[in-house]
Design a protein with these regions (language model features):
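Exposed beta-sheet edge/beta-hairpin loop segments within beta-rich domains
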Residues: 45-49, 190-191, 234
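Acidic, low-complexity intrinsically disordered regions
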Residues: 170-171, 265
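Active-site pocket scaffolds in enzymes
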Residues: 177-185, 192-195, 199-248, 254-266
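Acidic, glycine-rich active-site loops and adjacent beta-strand->loop/helix elements
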Residues: 27, 88, 205, 249-250
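Hydrophobic alpha-helical scaffolding
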Residues: 103, 172, 230-233
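Active-site microenvironments in enzyme catalytic cores
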Residues: 1-169, 177-181
């Protein structure tokens, strides 16, 4: 679908929850919820469209008191570091429930993070320019300097007892809105942040089809299935598939790895 009118004007987001954030190697159970096919009544059933979303998560220090905002110029002073982040989604549940208040059961069943947090200080050699933003952003979202980061990202799908197949090769530098802008927008109304708060970047998709950061895009909403090395096809993630995300930065003789976040999808419970 075309971007909504607000997408080029503000970093669209929503508040989540911490209770179902899990680390690498913790399996994810296929969720159930309401789905609806056009012309039919809603059904309560297991989601048939489980998707990964390739993201980075950034972690904050304690922020300012409630009622005070953080500017883009000072935002990185409040960011401790980053990890890999798989923001699981149930697309069919999401499609029915998200209007008008946004996703709920489609997102809160699990979010997976890698075990390593790389500090923002360590990432400074990999700072790059943010993509050109048109139209010009509002004053509180303007910034100076290099606020994006060159982080190479990969996603693999591994069927049960099968090989890992890379399905996505992307980069954090493709993000339209940088972290400083995201944090400035998050706090512009006076919302406070606390030490250890986790902010998801949003899906990281690049300019080419192999850099799209979700199955929704890679398989084009199921109309262009991916073929794995064993000959099987994927429109979305199947039971017992393992989704693996990896990330690293490299610059001459310097290489910093983010490790990986590895999560297997298990069948829905009765």
């Amino acid at each position: 679908n075309a971007l909504l009118p607000n997408w080029l004007w503000l970093p669209v987001g929503y508040h989540g929850r911490s209770s179902s954030i899990i680390t690498s190697e913790v399996p994810v159970v296929r969720p159930k919820g309401q789905t609806k096919v056009e012309g039919e009544n809603p059904k309560f059933e297991a989601s048939a469209r489980i998707d990964f979303e390739l993201e980075m998560g950034f972690y904050t220090f304690d922020g300012k008191p409630l009622g005070e905002r953080i500017s883009t110029a000072e935002a990185e002073d409040f960011i401790f570091g980053l990890s890999l982040f798989n923001d699981w989604s149930a697309r069919d549940i999401q499609q029915w429930e998200y209007v008008p208040l946004g996703p709920f059961l489609a997102k809160n069943f699990a979010s997976s993070i890698s075990p390593w947090i790389i500090t923002l200080d360590a990432l400074q050699p990999f700072a790059v320019d943010t993509p050109v933003q048109e139209p010009a952003v509002l004053p509180y979202l303007k910034f100076e300097g290099k606020k994006s980061y060159d982080i190479n990202l990969e996603v693999f799908i591994q069927p049960k007892d099968g090989a890992e197949d890379r399905v996505c090769l992307s980069n954090f530098k493709y993000m339209y809105w940088n972290m400083a802008q995201q944090l400035a927008h998050h706090t512009v109304n006076g919302c406070n942040i606390r030490c250890g708060d986790l902010m998801g970047s949003g899906t990281i998709s690049g300019p080419t089809p192999d850099s799209y950061g979700s199955m929704l895009e890679l398989a084009w909403k199921g109309t262009k299935p991916l073929t794995l090395s064993d000959g099987s096809q994927r429109r979305f993630i199947q039971d017992y598939d393992t989704v693996i995300m990896k990330g690293h930065c490299t610059n001459g003789n310097i290489r910093i790895g983010f490790g990986e976040v590895r999560s297997q999808l298990l069948p829905a419970q009765d």
